[in-house]
């Protein structure tokens, strides 16, 4: 499938006074689409599947959120992380959008109330984890509703070609057969050519359009330093950026705890995050990282996917 260059024309794009442009301006507060967004929106509104590869921070979510609001009905959004679902729902609600989520962090009563609102047509975007979406009960329930779009965030998780493969995502390959009349938007910031082909084949048998607007982030600088005294080098690196938000990755849980304690003992506001921690402690540390300045998260690879924080200055 051909990729879209950032400078490609968009002959089927919404007109400047179209509902898509009005929602972009009035709901989300943007005067114009970014490169690629306009044609992706038009593609989904035309009922065509789309694989979208765009850098982080480039507005991937708008590519499905705007069609969701233009065409009505219910858009189902698949996301791998509860924290990401909650963040996106909160942001949409602030913009006045009827969005909600059913997830494992919420009580049965809250989830049941969300479903009742969804079934009554009061929710426009419903965020679900892949394992919840693909249950027989949920699929049957959604078949009774006007599902007009399915969006899959972090779509690279479905591909065995990539390092981020998640088994629960593999079940999403049945979506095309289960919802044959519903366009699917697959979105990722991380997919080489082999991974892109794998995603498109699994989600819509390759029958869709692929949009690649590039991977380069010119505001990111990569540097390599020879390891001599790792702890001293780390402290100097982080300390030289005092008050800035960052992430330090470690290979093991033990090393994560030790490094966080070391940095904290040296005046750095460092917090640990790994899968071996109590869930409440993990969530508390993530909330502090997301909401307060100058926090350095010391973590395993359990942390990071879907984190939307504009002031991260070091990794």
Which residues make up each language-model segment?
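Helicase motor core with emphasis on the C-terminal RecA-like subdomain
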Residues: 2-6, 14-27, 31-35, 39-51, ...
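Hydrophobic positions on the alpha1 helix immediately C-terminal to the Walker A/P-loop
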Residues: 63, 67
């Amino acid at each position: 499938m051909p990729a879209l260059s950032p400078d490609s024309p968009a002959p089927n794009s919404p007109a400047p006074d179209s509902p898509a442009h009005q929602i972009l301006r009035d709901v989300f507060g943007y005067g114009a689409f970014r490169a690629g967004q306009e044609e992706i929106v038009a593609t989904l509104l035309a009922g065509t599947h789309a694989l979208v590869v765009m850098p982080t921070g480039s507005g991937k979510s708008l590519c499905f959120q705007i069609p969701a609001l233009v065409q009505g009905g219910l858009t189902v959004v698949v996301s791998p992380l509860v924290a990401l679902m909650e963040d996106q729902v909160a942001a949409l609600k602030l913009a006045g959008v009827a969005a909600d989520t059913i997830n494992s962090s919420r009580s049965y009563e809250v989830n049941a109330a969300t479903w009742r609102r969804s079934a009554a047509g009061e929710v426009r975007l419903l965020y679900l984890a892949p394992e919840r979406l693909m249950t027989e009960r949920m699929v049957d329930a959604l078949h009774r509703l006007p599902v007009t779009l399915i969006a899959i965030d972090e779509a690279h998780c479905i591909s065995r070609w990539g390092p981020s493969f998640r088994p629960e995502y593999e079940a999403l390959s049945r979506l095309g057969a289960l919802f044959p009349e519903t366009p699917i938007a697959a979105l990722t910031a991380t997919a080489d050519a082999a991974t892109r082909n794998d995603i498109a084949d699994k989600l819509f048998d390759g029958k869709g359009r692929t949009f690649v607007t590039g991977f380069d982030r010119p505001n990111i600088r990569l540097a390599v330093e020879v390891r001599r005294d790792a702890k001293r080098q780390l402290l100097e690196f982080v300390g030289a950026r005092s008050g800035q938000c960052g992430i330090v990755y470690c290979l093991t849980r033990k090393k994560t705890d030790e490094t966080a304690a070391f940095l904290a003992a040296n005046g750095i506001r460092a917090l640990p995050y790994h899968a071996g921690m109590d869930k409440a402690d993990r969530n508390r540390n993530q909330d502090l990282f997301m909401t307060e300045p100058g926090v350095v998260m010391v973590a395993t690879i359990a942390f990071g996917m879907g984190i939307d924080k504009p002031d991260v200055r070091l990794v």
